[in-house]
Amino acid sequence: MEMQHLLVVGVVTLAGFMRGITGFGGAALMAPVLSAMLGPVQAVVTALTLETAAALIMFPDAWPRFNRRVLLYLTIPACVTVPIGGYLLVNVDAFIMRKVIAGVVVVFALALFSGLRYSRAPRPATSLALGGIVGVLLGATSVGAPPVILYLLASSDSHTVIRANLTVFVTAISVIGLIMLSAIGAITVPVAADAGVAVIPFLIATWLGGKLFGKMNELVARRTALSLMLFMGVIGLLV
């Protein structure tokens, strides 16, 4: 048990550090391994708790920079469909959900690695549809950022604005996800306590990673994050 706790802290710390540097990838990096160690429900609750807590560090800086029009169309449908994902998380067999979580991470890591992106500028109808899909993904797996990244990279916004968009979007839907999971009884006192223990190392690592944002080569930071996401996803599929 002690070794498992150390592994959880290590994975959470690494995820926080990479999230601080890139603005994304925290949940995607930690969810597959946490799901294998703790079960899918605990993994999703932990990932969403940590993503929400990260707002304490990143949200104030992101708020004045994000693109309000684009995020409005993404966030509203995502919040509506999050409960569908939560239902799947709680009711589908745990082994299947573990593999689904890992598989989603592998697919999106490979897509981001390949340079795949949406080829047109974001439009309201497309944003609404994508938001609905992402809500289901986040509720079921805690991994909601990668498809939004693929979409937002097609915009003319700077990397700083895209990073702010991701921070605000993931924070909003993570909060809704936690409320939904609590409402359906998935967040018990032991589950909440275990998730709470991981908050401090995650926040410290996110803060440290944020200090390096802008000081590291953007391409190197992104490829490092994607390599780690892919590695964690493969581990989740194999164990």
Residue spans for each PLM region:
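Small-residue-rich hydrophobic segments that form or flank transmembrane alpha-helices
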Residues: 5-73, 135-138, 145-202, 206
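Residues that define the loop-to-transmembrane-helix transition and helix capping
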Residues: 41-44, 69, 95-98, 125, ...
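Hydrophobic alpha-helical transmembrane segments in multi-pass integral membrane proteins
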Residues: 43, 84-89, 94, 98, ...
